[in-house]
């Protein structure tokens, strides 16, 4: 059985790590490289970096910090932000990233998923999905441009259908960003994760809602996700990654210590 992954997420804006609540009101957390180094030393299995305004600003992630991160950590890391072409992805991978993640650009041009998978292999291609539960309709809807409050908008895709579509096109992994839970620390949306897990046959990473160690255990054991991504609990040192891994091992979760 493959070990479950713990994945700190660093949202990047203007060269600094920031964190919002439900994708709004971002506060500055600190500099990218020292945080990345700290998480790697604490025992993170992987890191994810989102340049959160790259897509809405119509630019590609700033590559200068990608190279600096690659120099100081020895764990895999994934980079997202405005990657719209094979050339964009190639440059980020050349700078040292192990994977690229696409979100809004995949919604604008679904064929991009296939192009990237064909060129770099599916293991390099992650699709991020920003999913919002609309209480009025009772549906999970995919959103676009969520890094910019003024431009974020619903798409025509329901989450389950988009999960099926991106797999068909070559996604090697899916990160499900559950917008209603983001930064609230009340736990991952297990109902939504189970709905997606039923139709997701590639590694699935839960994102949005981690507040306590038990939330990680629940995601692994009750929704069978492959990894759990979190930001604020790590940034604010509410949870230490080494201690979290020890706790998960005691809960009989397969984890790398």
Curated annotation (Swiss-Prot):
GO molecular function annotation? imidazoleglycerol-phosphate synthase activity; lyase activity
Query: Catalyzes what?
Result: 5-[(5-phospho-1-deoxy-D-ribulos-1-ylimino)methylamino]-1-(5-phospho-beta-D-ribosyl)imidazole-4-carboxamide + L-glutamine = D-erythro-1-(imidazol-4-yl)glycerol 3-phosphate + 5-amino-1-(5-phospho-beta-D-ribosyl)imidazole-4-carboxamide + L-glutamate + H(+)
What are the positions of the active site?
Answer: 11, 130
Which of UniProt's keywords are assigned here? Amino-acid biosynthesis, Cytoplasm, Histidine biosynthesis, Lyase
Entry's family note? Belongs to the HisA/HisF family.
Q: Provide the assembly information.
A: Heterodimer of HisH and HisF.
Described purpose of this protein according to its UniProt entry: IGPS catalyzes the conversion of PRFAR and glutamine to IGP, AICAR and glutamate. The HisF subunit catalyzes the cyclization activity that produces IGP and AICAR from PRFAR using the ammonia provided by the HisH subunit.
Name the UniProt record assigns to this protein: Imidazole glycerol phosphate synthase subunit HisF
Question: Which organism is the protein's source?
Answer: Photobacterium profundum (strain SS9)
